[in-house]
Structure formats: structure tokens, C-alpha cells
């Protein structure tokens, strides 16, 4: 049943007010799965078990050909002894392990939380406890952790939902935990340009000279590889080698989904699309043919993007999360271990935009639990000079005095989950 503030347009797009009632329903979900972040036709992950092929495909599909992830013969001669997955590969994994509901009425009532408002991934923070290797099978729990309300000149009222994440294996060993942040804002076209900070942003266009600058950066992309980064050689204030990503194209988005699957909702074809719409009715609208298609197409359909309040087609947040992972692993090399990545999406990354990645070492220390670590800050800046992503990372590194990296002791799995079979 629709709420009193809910309206559906002729094309099936549900529009709701961001009401106190709807926000409270989301707060009632704390410790339980977020009803706006769920799967469609199937709960199965893209990769049930990590394989060398899956890791290679993922890496290629995010634009990374690091042999540590792509070449088993190379990887077996590293300290890991086999192919490992780069940080963020876990987005392609995770058998459904969300907490079950004891009360069907509670589940049904709270399923209306923030229905009919647009969701934007705004960032997250992940902690990595061990590399994903061949044969690893992971379960995943997502749950609401916190709900905040924000007022802004651009979006008006919005709700920021912090979603907890935990991934573990059959022995309850945690590989990844952390949070993702999603901003929920009302679906509406921007009509007052004076209040729209994106109003002056025009689609990208590059001269031959600008394209050459991008291609020269690709030609000179740095990768440390087997050249071990030692703690003793690190100097605070050192700038990291620049990396470029883009110009972002729909082809890049297709590749990302080839490597990760659909990540969340699942946009399957033909009869499976019909089955998915039965489960996620609010996630489908009619297209220019009056046929039903998923709202995921805001990322490649300019008209729909405008209807939900975005000026142009834009990327999925995971695209830039993968940029950060690639930037960090290129610098850290084979013998380091990326323990923590915090990433914040600052602006939309429109189709056609380029992202220049830069970073700096801001701290080094002997951590009592992690051993030798360095702290890195990085940013991605587009061709307009605006940051579209900021990130920080904790990297565990080898030391001549203290020896190779020793993997940290993982925490216990979240209590907000179902037990592993």
C-alpha cells in the first residue's frame, strides 16, 4: 500500500516525501537489513567461491592488469604463494547471511522505510583482515547501523543511512568488515539553478592535447610490484605517483558489471527481469518503449537521471572505490597489505569525466597491533578541478627491523547475521 505522501508517475516512477515517519521506519530497522539495499530475482552472489579466473576477470574489468591478481604463475612466487584478490573484489562475493526477522509484521511495516526516494552511494570504510585467495567462500551480512538527517541547500532534506557490512567464511573467520553510507533524497528535477551547485557543470570535451596528457599518464603508470616497500624507506610528506582514470564511458560501466555482477539489485534479462520486478516493483519504471526497465539505468539514461535530480548520466560509486583500490595497490606493491580504506564520493562522476588520482603519505608508525604501518590520504580530481573522491588508507608494510607483514587478528563476526550452515 502506498503511503499518503507517495505518488507514482505515468512511467511508474515512485516519488515520496522524505517524511519523519519514513525516517523512523528506517531507524526501526537498526540491526536488520536495509529494505532499500536488497537483491532482486536471486540472492546468489556473482562469485560464490573465489577462483583465479574470477580474480583475473575482476581486475581486468576495473582496468587493473597487476600480475599479482591476474597471473597465477607470477603470484605463486610472491609471499602469498598464489593468486590473491585486490581490495574491493569482495563486492562480487557474499552468500546471503543477513539477519532473519522474527516478526513478519515488523518486517512488512518497516519495508516501507524511505520508499520512493532516490538513493546515492556516498562512500564507506572497509577493514581487511586477510587476502581473499583461491577457494575462499564468503557469507555476507548487511544491516542498518545509524540514520541521520541532513539539510542542504542543494538537496534540501536528506537521510544518511550508515549500513554495516561483515563478510566471513565457513569457520567464522572475518575477511572484511566496515560500513557503507547512502544518501536518500527526494526525486525531483532541479528547477532553481541558483541553488544547484552542479548547474554550471557542462559535459566533458577534450582537445587532442588533453587526450595526449591522459594517454601519457597511462603510459607512465607506476606499479611497485616485487620491489618491496620498507617502512624504513618511507618518508612522511612523500607524494605518491599520479594515476589517471577515464574519461569515464558506458563501456567502463559494462566492464565493471562484467567483473562484479550487479552488486546489489540484480538487473537480469527477459523472464528473469519480470521475476525481479515482482520482488522489487519500485525499482522498475517504463522506458521510451513503454516497457519496464530497472532504475539502474540512471547511470546510462540521461532522461531518467534528470528525473531523479541529476544533471547527466553518472557512475556507480563502486567505480571510484575500485580506482582507490588500484591506486593504493600499485603503490604498496606485492609485499604490503591494505588494511583499511575509507572513501568518500564528493561529487557526481559524469559520463565523460576524467579522474586524476594523487596521494601523500601523512604518517608512519609502529602500531601495537598492526606493526609497521603508513597512513595515506588521496584524492581524485576531475577535469573541472573538483574533487570527486577523497580517501584515506592504512597500509601494513614490511620492515627490515620487524620483518614481513603479519596479518592482523580479525574480530568476531557481527551478531546481526544468520549462522553459517
Region locations from a protein language model:
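Residue-level signal for well-ordered, solvent-exposed loop/turn and beta-edge residues enriched
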Residues: 172-174, 238, 386
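A structural microfeature
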Residues: 175-178, 241, 389
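Flexible glycine-rich active-site/ligand-binding loops centered on an Asp-His dyad
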Residues: 158-168, 174, 178-200, 394-401
Amino acid at each position: 500500500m502506498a503511503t499518503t505522501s507517495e505518488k507514482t508517475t505515468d512511467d511508474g516512477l515512485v516519488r515520496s516525501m522524505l517524511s519523519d515517519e519514513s525516517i523512523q521506519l528506517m531507524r526501526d530497522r537498526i540491526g536488520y537489513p536495509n529494505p532499500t539495499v536488497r537483491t532482486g530475482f536471486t540472492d546468489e552472489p556473482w562469485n560464490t567461491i573465489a577462483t583465479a579466473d574470477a580474480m583475473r576477470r575482476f581486475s581486468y574489468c576495473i582496468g587493473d592488469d597487476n600480475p599479482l591478481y591476474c597471473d597465477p604463475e607470477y603470484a605463486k612466487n610472491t609471499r602469498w604463494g598464489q593468486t590473491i584478490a585486490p581490495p574491493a573484489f569482495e563486492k562480487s562475493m557474499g552468500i546471503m547471511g543477513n539477519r532473519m526477522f522474527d516478526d513478519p509484521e515488523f518486517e512488512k511495516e518497516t519495508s516501507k522505510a524511505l520508499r520512493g526516494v532516490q538513493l546515492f552511494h556516498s562512500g564507506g570504510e572497509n577493514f581487511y583482515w586477510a587476502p581473499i585467495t583461491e577457494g575462499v567462500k564468503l557469507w555476507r551480512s548487511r544491516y542498518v547501523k545509524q540514520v541521520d538527517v541532513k539539510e542542504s541547500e542543494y538537496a534540501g532534506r536528506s537521510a544518511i543511512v550508515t549500513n554495516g557490512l561483515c563478510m566471513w567464511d565457513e569457520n567464522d573467520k572475518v575477511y572484511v568488515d566496515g560500513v557503507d553510507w547512502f544518501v536518500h533524497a527526494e526525486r525531483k528535477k532541479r528547477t532553481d539553478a541558483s541553488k544547484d551547485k552542479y548547474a554550471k557543470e557542462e559535459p566533458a570535451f577534450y582537445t587532442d592535447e588533453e587526450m595526449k596528457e591522459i594517454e601519457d599518464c597511462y603510459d607512465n603508470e607506476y606499479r611497485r610490484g616485487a620491489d618491496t616497500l620498507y617502512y624504513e624507506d618511507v618518508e612522511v610528506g612523500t607524494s605518491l605517483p599520479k594515476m589517471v582514470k577515464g574519461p569515464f564511458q558506458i563501456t567502463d560501466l559494462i566492464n565493471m558489471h562484467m567483473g562484479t555482477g550487479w552488486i546489489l539489485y540484480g538487473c537480469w534479462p527477459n523472464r528473469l527481469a519480470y521475476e525481479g520486478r515482482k520482488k522489487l516493483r519500485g525499482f522498475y519504471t517504463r522506458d521510451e518503449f513503454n516497457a519496464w526497465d530497472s532504475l539502474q539505468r540512471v547511470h546510462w539514461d540521461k532522461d531518467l537521471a534528470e528525473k531523479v535530480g541529476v544533471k547527466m548520466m553518472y557512475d556507480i560509486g563502486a567505480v571510484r572505490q575500485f580506482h582507490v583500490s588500484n591506486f593504493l595497490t600499485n603503490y604498496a606493491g606485492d609485499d604490503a597489505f591494505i588494511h583499511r580504506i575509507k572513501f568518500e564520493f564528493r561529487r557526481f562522476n559524469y559520463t565523460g569525466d576524467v579522474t586524476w588520482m594523487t596521494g601523500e603519505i601523512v604518517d608512519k608508525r609502529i602500531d601495537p597491533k598492526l606493526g609497521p604501518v603508513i597512513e595515506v590520504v588521496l584524492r581524485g580530481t576531475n577535469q573541472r578541478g573538483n574533487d570527486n573522491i577523497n580517501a584515506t588508507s592504512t597500509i601494513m608494510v614490511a620492515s627490515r627491523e620487524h620483518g614481513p607483514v603479519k596479518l592482523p587478528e580479525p574480530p568476531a563476526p557481527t551478531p546481526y547475521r544468520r549462522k553459517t550452515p
